[in-house]
């Protein structure tokens, strides 16, 4: 199934031809800007309306004036995310319309909300609907700047990006092609950061990134302490990987010298301590000292986080696709290189209702139905999406990653 092969052009920019017959009226309603009249108006607070106006509703490109209502926004999203139903084996316009009505109802009644790129871009020219991406960073100038270009395309459309810089050779290592030495991962992280600074995501928000370095990379100490200056990397979360080897040594031999692996030479060596001028002191970092440094800086600045990368790969259900090296900016989605994920959240607070005796009860039956419908919504996003690169299109449709979470947990407990 490939939405690019579908042929009936809609007023909202997505194409589809139903496999089944369906009705012309159902197709007309799917293509309409206004939702069917019998659908309820969105239940929105004053604050929510302000956020919609500021970030999500369509604006006139010349005047900046809002030209879309919340009702039209939710139908734009619902109808476009339902259109992949037309290309399924049992697809028909009537079925797609029924699914679109379900999607609209979930959003209008505040049961569910998809990630920002879906709200911003569904049915619009940009068409990029995913929130999370991971890009590879190869140890070459070409590979590094290919990733920067891909980052620009993703963040322009409202997505966030994660990277592992662990393949880059360490500071001071030789560059055979030029005869010089490299500045190491930290200098290139700053190049990525500057590129992100120059891009305002979808004209709605600044870019977000995750930068990861293996705990056994030779530049790990500089990486851990890099955000001690709070003015650095304002658009980055950073994390070090904690391997099984490191954790085992931390438990059993914390005073053992911490060994690191040069990604170019594949040579393991003890990690030397250096003075303020960068000169070797003749001493080595121990495993316990490296861990203490991580804890100290995480307490002071909130960075770095720790990604247990071996555990991630052990639990990866699609190991045949390859190793996972990085996560999305918030860290909840480990992804393969060129992979993406679209996200959404179920509102738990609104599912607490008065019981038979007036006591608050959680509506588990509605919760189950919402999960079923929203999983379908997120999977449809994979097909409706316009990916910024063919590699991302291929990987995303191979892995079919979705992330369904919850919001309103505190509200549910309060009720």
List the predicted regions and their residue ranges.
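Extended catalytic cores of very large enzyme megasubunits
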Residues: 1-415
